[in-house]
Amino acid sequence: MKIKLQPQIGAAYEELTIDKPVTVRELADRYQPELPYRVLLANVDGKDEELTFLLHRDCSVRLLDMRTYSANLVYQHSLSLIYLKAVMDVLGDMAVEIENSLNKGLYTEIKTPEPITTEQIAAVEGRMHELVEADLPIVREVYTREEAVEIWGAYNYPEKS
C-alpha cells in the first residue's frame, strides 16, 4: 500500500510503501521524535480522522498538531474530558459546566451547594496531572439517542439529553 504522507504542516509530502495496515498513531509514532508538537489528529484523503483510524489502502495523510484548528479542538475536548473525570474523582457527582474558550483557556463552573475550596481545586489539578501521566486512551463510543439520554442523566447532565 502506498501512503503519501505530510509529516507536519508545511513539510513536503513523502511517498511510503507499507506492507500491512497501520493505524495513524503507529505512523505518527515513527515521526513524532522529529516533530515540534505532538500529533493529535490526521487528515486522510481530505477527512479528519482519529489516531486509531486504520490505514488499509492507498491514501494521502497529513499529520496534524495543535497548530491546526481541528487538532486544537481535539486537544480542548480531551482536556475537558480529563477535567470532568478529575472533578468526578475528587468531588464526586457534581454538575460541571464548561463554557466557551477564553484566551487559550476554558471557563468552567462546578455546581456545588458550598463554595469550592483552594484545597479542592489543588486536588482536582493534581488528579488531572495523574490522569495525563497515566496516558489512558480516550475511546470514542457511539450510542443511540435513548442510550445517550440515559447515560448523561446518570451523570447529572440532563441538559445534554
Located regions from the model:
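Non-catalytic interaction/regulatory segments
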Residues: L102, T112-S161
